Amino acid sequence: MEIKNKKLKETSDVLLSLTYLIKSYEYRDRGNLLESLYYLDKALELNPDFKFAKFLKAISLAILGDINKSIECLEDITSNSNDPVAYALLGQLYELLGNFDNALECYEKSLGIEEKFATAFFLKVLCLGLSGKYDELLKCCDRLISFAPNFIPAYIIKANMLRKLGRYEEALACVNKVLELKENDTNAIYLKALILNRIGNCDEALKYYEKLIDELNVTWIEVIREAIYLSFLFNKLDKAEKYIEMGLKLRPDDASLWYFKGKLYEKQNKFEEALKYYNKAIQLMPHHTKALLAKARVLEKLGRIEESIECYNKALDR
């Protein structure tokens, strides 16, 4: 009789813990994570080995910002489980705390359980980048691409790393693969423009910057700056003016853009106007060497020699 009652109690506890789990999910669905956590704890009081409840608790704690307690839950789960998702999530939490070695160990364990777990591969790639382990990152990208050949972020990360390492032709091959998969991928087009500019193919680089701005409506300030610089290089002053004004609407406090505006007027021999904008650039950034040199040059053209010499000296002191 006692054994029967014990079994009935165990069954009752399991059913009640499931009820609490459902209740927890209902509150979670409404966005009430604290109440959801309360019912998860109730479920775990009745059934301490209820791994799914522990997993949901770990996720809720992480969302609420209690990373350490979330880690405790996941460590408890992974201590006697081969759940690749739990290891991947645990790795993410270690990464948030800056513990990259532990994070990488968790990703390895996750991939040891399921070697084609693309999410774990991607998280590992990101962690390797933050850890400065670039050769391993490239190898990991290749493995990820072998399992998920259409996964664009892997190509983008690989291309960017190859670019940083000076392996430009390989980087271009990765970028071109992305553009085969997604013709107007802005990250890939931006990387292609950067690489083309770096290897001296400036006219082609400008075409890609123009595509980003004029066709794809990209308003990244770095893209605009590069487009302005190359527009000047090829004496496309109308384009340069258009991009300068676009940039200043976004960042009126950007000294480089005011310098470019001064340069535009100097190229048109409007020296007083050029001087005004060079002064604006220097006001925003007193040590802007290019603006100081440009101002000195314009003052010299205007016959204001003493001021010009003073400005040259300021520039040379930097």
Curated annotation (Swiss-Prot):
Domain of life according to the entry: Archaea
This protein's UniProt keywords: Repeat, TPR repeat
Which PROSITE patterns would you find in this protein's record? TPR, TPR_REGION
InterPro entries cross-referenced by the UniProt entry: TPR-like_helical_dom_sf, TPR_rpt
Q: Which Cys pairs are S-S linked?
A: none
The UniProt record lists the keyword Repeat = yes
Repeat positions for TPR: 17-50, 84-117, 119-151, 152-185, 186-219, 221-254, 255-288, 289-318
Name assigned to this protein? TPR repeat-containing protein MJ0940
Q: Which species does this protein come from?
A: Methanocaldococcus jannaschii (strain ATCC 43067 / DSM 2661 / JAL-1 / JCM 10045 / NBRC 100440) (Methanococcus jannaschii)
